[in-house]
């Protein structure tokens, strides 16, 4: 045992070797020492446990293993992946892909000084939300708009500004929870207001709102149940009905759309999603929605509505805490400008482009992917093109599915499939699919930059 342990080199010895010196120059002394200690400890533990040297880890080749480990630890964690899950707006994979115009605008904002809060024509300071507000007003018909860093922040700012220390009435069937345990009741608590639930889970009437109103009521609130749907014996109150009640009793109505859409998705043959423009036209005081979901832009929370209410939001101390930086604003501005030319949206917005692909187009992709994979995989794996059902994702239209095609992979054992999935994850750009029906599904509707995927698979 002692003889085996004696072959383990010291950290100091590794540092003095030429290969060790080169690694220190490349990765730094601290990182090298940490990895060296880890490799040495692992080798020592193996000897103590098995009373032998590991076959795949010779004691005289530790520097090679250290180099491999250092290379892996230095890789950027948020690396590019190919999304073949069938979920287009996959929250865990970054949601919307930016348009080329948005990427260019954001890159320019990073490289140069910009007129972030400067009115060039007037030669004086301006507000960073001004341009975004003007675009949103033109697109939605709202009087004014402001931007924060996500939709949860938009809801928080709205509640903190208008309902702190007071009551907000919401239907019990609209108390949503989204990914990451974000809950409307929790946001209300953080904003310092009291939630008043009305109605039941499946049925809420206008009389329920009316009965709950008192001198402490600050807001009537509608929350779009974007990530679930209640069906069957149901009844809900529309924004228009709430607005009429609010006007009668002198209370504003605010609507959280969650995902939100600026275009009628049905015109592209897609399931309909509530339009921001419709909520504004109904008289709702403020509407909140996300920029990185159906809108197809960077992460941001957008609030549109009455000018006086937007001004109150801008004046609240939380607005500065939650404001967006120049890069996000540049990307969002470029994204919104696409909506001024709605006929070109499917060309410029990657999200909409993916959503509107024809089955014939997907079949061509599926055939190419099947051919590329068949050259790469051994005889254990059987590849087949099958019909699939994709989804939009990020809480948008949770019960709706989009017709799609996928390359499915089966194997003699589940272990073989898991090994293949792991191999896909170890590629230069990991391939992320999904498991179902004892198959690995690679759905073509959700994958962007398809040609690059094929090039990677066919690299020698």
Swiss-Prot record:
The family database entries (Gene3D superfamilies) matched by this protein are listed as: 3.90.1150.180, Type I PLP-dependent aspartate aminotransferase-like (Major domain)
Q: What is this protein called?
A: L-seryl-tRNA(Sec) selenium transferase
Pfam families, from UniProt?
Se-cys_synth_N (PF12390), SelA (PF03841)
UniProt similarity note:
Belongs to the SelA family.
The record's section on InterPro entries has:
PyrdxlP-dep_Trfase, PyrdxlP-dep_Trfase_major, SelA-like, SelA_trans, SelA_trans_N_dom
Q: In which pathway does it act?
A: Aminoacyl-tRNA biosynthesis; selenocysteinyl-tRNA(Sec) biosynthesis; selenocysteinyl-tRNA(Sec) from L-seryl-tRNA(Sec) (bacterial route): step 1/1
What molecular functions are annotated in GO for this chain?
L-seryl-tRNA(Sec) selenium transferase activity
Entry keywords, A to Z: Cytoplasm, Protein biosynthesis, Pyridoxal phosphate, Selenium, Transferase
The reactions it catalyses are:
L-seryl-tRNA(Sec) + selenophosphate + H(+) = L-selenocysteinyl-tRNA(Sec) + phosphate
Native source organism of the sequence? Haemophilus ducreyi (strain 35000HP / ATCC 700724)
This protein's superkingdom? Bacteria
Q: Give the EC number.
A: 2.9.1.1
Q: Where is it localised?
A: Cytoplasm
Q: Where in the sequence is N6-(pyridoxal phosphate)lysine found?
A: 293
The UniProt function text for this chain reads: Converts seryl-tRNA(Sec) to selenocysteinyl-tRNA(Sec) required for selenoprotein biosynthesis.
Q: What class of enzyme is it?
A: transferase
A Gene Ontology BP annotation from the UniProt entry: conversion of seryl-tRNAsec to selenocys-tRNAsec
Cofactor(s) essential for the protein: pyridoxal 5'-phosphate
Q: What is the lineage of its organism?
A: Bacteria, Pseudomonadati, Pseudomonadota, Gammaproteobacteria, Pasteurellales
Q: Under the cellular component aspect of Gene Ontology, which terms does the record hold?
A: cytoplasm
């Amino acid at each position: 045992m002692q003889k085996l342990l004696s072959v383990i080199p010291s950290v100091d010895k590794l540092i003095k070797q030429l290969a060790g010196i080169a690694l220190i120059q490349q990765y730094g002394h601290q990182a090298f020492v940490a990895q060296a200690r880890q490799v040495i400890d692992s080798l020592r533990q193996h000897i103590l446990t098995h009373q032998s040297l590991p076959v795949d880890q010779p004691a005289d080749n530790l520097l090679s293993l250290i180099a491999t480990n250092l290379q892996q630890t230095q890789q950027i964690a948020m690396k590019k992946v190919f999304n073949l899950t069938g979920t287009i707006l996959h929250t865990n994979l970054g949601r919307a892909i930016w348009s080329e115009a948005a990427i260019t605008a954001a890159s320019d904002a990073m490289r140069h000084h910009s007129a972030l809060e400067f009115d060039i024509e007037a030669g004086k300071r301006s507000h960073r939300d001004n341009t975004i507000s003007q675009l949103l007003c033109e697109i939605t018909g709202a009087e004014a708009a402001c931007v924060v860093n996500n939709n949860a922040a938009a809801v928080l700012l709205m509640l903190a500004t208008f309902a702190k220390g007071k009551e907000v009435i919401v239907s019990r069937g609209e108390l949503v929870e989204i990914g990451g345990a974000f809950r409307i009741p929790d946001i209300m608590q953080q904003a310092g207001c009291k939630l008043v639930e009305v109605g039941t889970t499946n049925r809420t009437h206008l009389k329920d709102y009316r009965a709950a109103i008192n001198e402490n009521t600050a807001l009537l609130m509608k929350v779009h149940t974007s990530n679930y749907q209640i069906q069957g014996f149901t009844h809900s109150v529309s924004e228009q009905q709430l607005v009429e009640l609010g006007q009668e009793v002198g209370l504003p109505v605010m609507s959280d759309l969650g995902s939100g859409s600026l275009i009628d998705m049905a015109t592209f043959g897609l399931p309909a999603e509530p339009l921001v423009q419709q909520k504004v036209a109904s008289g709702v005081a403020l509407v909140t929605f996300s920029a990185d979901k159906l809108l197809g832009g960077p992460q941001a929370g957008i609030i549109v509505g009455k000018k006086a209410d937007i001004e109150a939001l801008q004046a609240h101390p939380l607005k500065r805490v939650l404001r967006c930086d120049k890069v996000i604003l540049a990307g969002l501005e470029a994204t919104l400008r696409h909506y001024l030319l709605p006929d070109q949206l499917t060309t410029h917005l990657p999200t909409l482009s993916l959503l509107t692909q024809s089955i014939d187009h997907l079949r061509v992709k599926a055939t190419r992917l099947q051919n590329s994979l068949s050259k790469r995989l051994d005889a254990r794996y059987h590849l087949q093109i099958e019909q699939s059902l994709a989804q939009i994702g990020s809480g948008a239209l949770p019960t709706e599915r989009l017709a799609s095609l996928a390359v499915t992979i089966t194997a003699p054992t589940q272990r073989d499939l898991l090994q293949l999935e792991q191999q896909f994850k170890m590629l230069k750009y990991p391939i992320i699919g999904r498991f179902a029906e004892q198959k690995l599904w690679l759905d073509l509707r959700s994958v962007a930059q398809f040609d690059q995927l094929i090039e990677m698979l066919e690299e020698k």
